[in-house]
Amino acid sequence: FGGAQALSYAAEHITSGDEQLALLVGVDTQVCHGMLRCGAIGLITGIGNVLPQPVLKLFELCLMALNGDAQAKSYANQLDDALMVLSTFDEGPELVLYYKYLLFLRGESEYEFHFNAFDELSPSQKSFAENHLKLFERWWDGWEGKNHQTN
C-alpha cells in the first residue's frame, strides 16, 4: 500500500483482527504513521539502504512509543521529520537513481554508474540530494534522540 490513506485503509479494513495478516510500511514518508497509527510491524524503505542506522533507530523508537514511551514517540517524530526530504525520493519514478546517488556520496563507488549511461539525475537533482544528505548528517550527529534507550 502507498501513503497514509492507504495504510489507514489497510489497517482498518484488511489487517486488523486477522493474526495471519501483517501490515508493513512500504513508503518511506509513512513510517511513524504506519507503525504508530496503523499497527504496521515492519518497514521496507529506500532510505534505509542509504542510512541504515537512523532508519533502524526510527523503527526502534516507534516500537518503544507503542509500549508507552512518550519521549520515544517525540524522538520518532523528530527523526521522521528530519528524514522527510530524503524519504520523499521513495515516492517518485527516480527513486533508484536518487538512492544510488546517495550511496555513492556515502562512499560506495560501485553505485556511481547505471545500466544506461543516459539514465541519471540532473545536476540540480544531484545538488538537491547532496545538500539534503549533508543537512541530515549534520542534524543526526548532534541529535540526542539517537542515544535514547529503553528503560
Placement of each model-derived feature along the sequence:
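C-terminal extensions of enzymes
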Residues: S87-N151
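Catalytic alpha/beta core domains of metabolic enzymes, predominantly
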Residues: F1-P93
